[in-house]
Amino acid sequence: MIEILLDPFRYDFMIRSLITAFASGAMLSLLGPFTINRNMGFMADAMAHATLPIIAVGVFLGFSISELGVPAAILIAIFLGLIIKNTNVGEDTAIGIIFSSFFALGFVLISLLNVTVNLEDLLFGQILAVNISDVYIVVSLLILVILVTVTYFKQLLFYSFDPIGAEVKGLNTTFLNYLFLILLSIAIVGSLQTVGIILVLSMLIIPAAAAKLVTETFTASIGVSVLFGTISSITGLYLSYFLNLPSGPSMSLVATTIFVIAFLSKKIRKKGSLATVTVS
């Protein structure tokens, strides 16, 4: 058993991939509970798709996806925030417009600029292709997300549950909103090479949703979400290695399996509690 677990460590590319998978899984699942609490799943998906034109231009200029992380995240977060704030068509409608138009623009730019990029890797991730520079960047982004989240945890928590109350209390809600959007964009862009544009939402939402089913408090759900997210990433990568499966979809399916187990576990516990009450 130990030999099986250690086998991937014989290869440098697998060591890089495992570190990146852990960092991406932790980064996304850390922000997942906040995203669910604020009903921002659709927004997060739009952010992922909005990265495509930036990636197209960046790759054309000679940058890697990881190197585009922070500047792309800031641009996307600010742009989305401004569009939603200054339009009267409704938040979901504005996000839907951004989602589809930016995704379409990305493919047009890839064609016009004659960018050499593997679309399957872009959409579903190709973690096995990460280099040492990508590893340093993704780990640095994880540290940045953790530090900022810990520093502003109480404010983000208050704003997440009660935006109006936070504003009444004197918190700068505009700053907190853009701060979270930037953190979310950083996590998404930093994880694109791991799970791709299509599946990044699954690694953001599913571990957090599973954690919500098995915990009683929001703070506890964050810790459990990170645990589920990292387990999903590492286990998915192991499955990819031993069964020759695509890494991104494997991670997503492991996360889904954890969610199903958590869901069934809660149902069983609930039935057990009702049976105990009935007998009493």
Report each predicted region and the residues it spans.
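Membrane-interfacial amphipathic/re-entrant helices at transmembrane-helix boundaries
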Residues: M1-A26, S273-T276
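Cytosolic-side transmembrane-helix boundaries in multi-pass membrane proteins
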Residues: L245-S252, T256-S280
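Membrane-interface helix termini and inter-helical loops of multi-pass transporters
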Residues: I2-Y11, T116-V130, Y238-Y241
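Short loop segments and helix-boundary regions at transmembrane helix junctions
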Residues: P33-V115, K212-G223, S240-L243, K267-I268
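Membrane-helix/interface signature in polytopic inner-membrane proteins
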Residues: L147-F180
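Transmembrane alpha-helical segments in multi-pass inner-membrane proteins
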Residues: I198-P249
